[in-house]
Amino acid sequence: MQNVRLDEAQAGIKIAGRNINNLRYADDTTLIVESKEELKSLLMKVKEESEKVGLKLNILKTKIMTSSSITSWKIDGETMETVRGFFFLGSKITADGDCSHDTNRHLLLGRKAMTKLDSILKSRDITLPTKVCLVKAMLFPVDTYGCESWTIKKTEHWRFDAFEFWCWRRLLRVPWTARRSSQPILKEIRSECSLEGLMLNLKIQYCGYLMQRADSLEKILMLGKIEGRRRRGRQRMRWLDGITHLIDMSLSKLWEIVKEREAWYAVVHGVAKS
């Protein structure tokens, strides 16, 4: 892939003045372009360089995701499948850029993992504090994987809260028909940090990590401005909007706080505690 020199190609999208046209990780390569012609140009470069070292581009495993109405596309007479989303490094990326697809998927995976732990969590030989630690160590990471990059709306917050209480009620063997409020359950569990609090803490830590770095690709993707116009009507919530709303300060103030480690650690601790 280094021989293809994709980074030197003009095709791609510009974020903060930097041209980005590919994301590479092990055997997964994602090409990012603005037009059909640019995609064909990059694909042919990858195909030609692969053939030089005895590799073949597998068209059946190559998918196209587009925000336009392209339904099918051919390269060298072979039809490439068009999809509305794909998985990359364990996260689902969709054409509409909405994180709710990924959050709902992780909630379903969390419920599945919880049911697999039934035999352990229902055992009377294991103490309640140990069971709580097992849930936090084996279940919550399934739900929070990749949450640092999510743009979470109010609906998703409610769903994660509902999922957490579902876990605790199942752990305590409290049926859904029982009229028990959440406060007595939390007192019995004695959980210091909620699932939502854990996610917010991870997002804040990741934000500080990005802003303290130099001009890295991750920082440009998260904080850089994309050329072009946003659509008309009410604008969708951005990742950075959620961060500034969470810590209740402007972006300029955030830049100043991040430069001072002790002040930033105090902000992170305050968010986790609240």
Question: What annotation goes with each model-predicted range?
Answer:
Residues M1-S274:
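Short linear motifs embedded in intrinsically disordered, charge-biased segments
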